[in-house]
UniProtKB/Swiss-Prot annotation:
GTP binds at residues 15-22, 92-96, 154-157. The modification N6-methyllysine is found at residues 3, 31, 317, 391. The keyword Iron does not apply. This is Elongation factor 1-alpha. The modification N6,N6-dimethyllysine is found at residues 3, 317. Residues 71-75 are annotated as: G2. The lineage of its organism: Eukaryota, Fungi, Dikarya, Ascomycota, Pezizomycotina. One of its GO terms (molecular function) is GTPase activity. Residues 193-195 are annotated as: G5. This protein promotes the GTP-dependent binding of aminoacyl-tRNA to the A-site of ribosomes during protein biosynthesis. PANTHER family: TRANSLATION FACTOR (PTHR23115). The gene is TEF. GO terms for cellular component: cytoplasm. Gene3D superfamilies: P-loop containing nucleotide triphosphate hydrolases, Translation factors.
Amino acid sequence: MGKEDKAHINVVVIGHVDSGKSTTTGHLIYKCGGIDKRTIEKFEKEAAELGKGSFKYAWVLDKLKAERERGITIDIALWKFETPKYYVTVIDAPGHRDFIKNMITGTSQADCAILIIAAGTGEFEAGISKDGQTREHALLAYTLGVKQLIVAINKMDTTQWSQARFEEIIKETKNFIKKVGYNPATVAFVPISGFNGDNMLEASTNCPWYKGWEKETKAGKSTGKTLLEAIDAIEQPKRPTDKPLRLPLQDVYKIGGIGTVPVGRIETGVLKPGMVVTFAPSNVTTEVKSVEMHHEQLAQGVPGDNVGFNVKNVSVKDIRRGNVAGDSKNDPPVGAASFTAQVIVLNHPGQVGAGYAPVLDCHTAHIACKFAELLEKIDRRTGKAVETSPKFIKSGDAAIVKMIPSKPMCVEAFTDYPPLGRFAVRDMRQTVAVGVIKAVDKTQAVAGKVTKSAAKAAKK
């Protein structure tokens, strides 16, 4: 397979604070990744000087994280590694303050979650206890549509690679992920030591009892031994090029001599020069003159591409961040008057009732929305109603809620356009709830502004 033919996939690494996420991820990036030797030697030298020699892989990741948090845009290649079949990007590791928010408004949807579980005595139990972060992260991943999962049982060296401990942990973890919603038969369970790099890329010699992992999905059965093989066995996601265009704007620039240039990530569909696009909820329709990515002109942009595109006769005042561009002839986006969503309250100190009006982060929009009506309280696992018209909901509860945005916003049902159908509820500077949109009451598009070039292009 030629280098260019490899598919790109995104993984998110989840697990308890001390499960060894950084060390494990650092190791993969270190061994198969985009970090050049010079950088690594520099990091190793610094780590040794600070007496952190033992943490060198985690140190690599900490350095990257620190630079990222300081707003230094890190060469994103550093967060990539290669398997025989894929280019893999690690989109975020929890522990990062905004992990939950990032996962939802996410720069990209993860195709697979890697759940790292620590095998140490007491560690495992703490990690998946009732109030554990692990449960929350796994639930989030599942709720937000990350349908594939790999479980890595880490720190096996601390248990002397005990088969009994491994089997005990697998039994417990299977129950745990089943409750979250995953089917254990479709999941690879891999014993590793991220610290020693054992069973990560090459089969470990420390566990002669280990016969390998196997999983069975609709696509068939696959088996392997190492974590790398498990990542390689992720099923390639279908990218939604066949859906109508949805492109949430991240920014709108005014560039001298060129004009107005909206910038954003194509979530679904394709964007081509000559297309007539409508921006919602601004309700402005115009023609796309050119599309570019990394300063190169594109014949077309596809899902996942971060593009800038030049539009005719539209001023920077007409459109803004949070607007969504779509094809004016193919299910164009419109604003939402209200919508119903399944909301899961994660950590709110009090009770949430009708009238609560926090800020919603949905794709690039950031808008206050009112909980107009609590329709029913539901069981998080089954989705079945347990109470109609509850007065309040609290942390741990899930409910179907009717929501009304305080000003026009463009959202979609999760089943139609996933990236525009999930949101984070922010209050008190933290994510207090997450939601998945079930249905949208779309405002009837009144005749908006149609530029001359759009009218002309439409006649063609």
